[in-house]
Amino acid sequence: MERVAKLASERAVVVFTASNCGMCHAVTSLLVGELGVNAAVHELDKDPRGRDMERELARRLNGGGGGGRALPAVFVGGNLVGGANRVMSLHLAGELVPMLKNAGALWL
């Protein structure tokens, strides 16, 4: 979907979430609160086209097959990184901060 691609490239870090999603809140808190990233956060449950975008994200996250959890979906430098498990794994492995720096999302 063209809208997902357009929104995903609007900033160095873009997070697609839902307002009632605990894992979405955890990922957003990590990126924005703990790491200080100026991410664009899109709450799809508040967007009239959110359901269509969530389906597209599920397709991308699950290898084209759809199904499974679509949110949160995190893009860094316009590229899909993945969901909560992937972001947390990268952070614990020490790989998230360098990725964010390379995308221009962190300066320190």
Swiss-Prot record:
InterPro entries: GlrX-like_pln_2, Glutaredoxin, Glutaredoxin_subgr, Thioredoxin-like_sf. Disulfide bonds join 21-24. Keywords: Cytoplasm, Disulfide bond, Electron transport, Nucleus, Redox-active center, Transport. GO terms for cellular component: cytoplasm; nucleus. Residues 1-107 form the Glutaredoxin domain. It comes from the Eukaryota. CDD domains: GRX_GRXh_1_2_like. It is found in: Cytoplasm; Nucleus. A motif (Responsive for interaction with TGA factors) lies at residues 105-108. Belongs to the glutaredoxin family. CC-type subfamily. Has a glutathione-disulfide oxidoreductase activity in the presence of NADPH and glutathione reductase. Reduces low molecular weight disulfides and proteins. This is Glutaredoxin-C10.
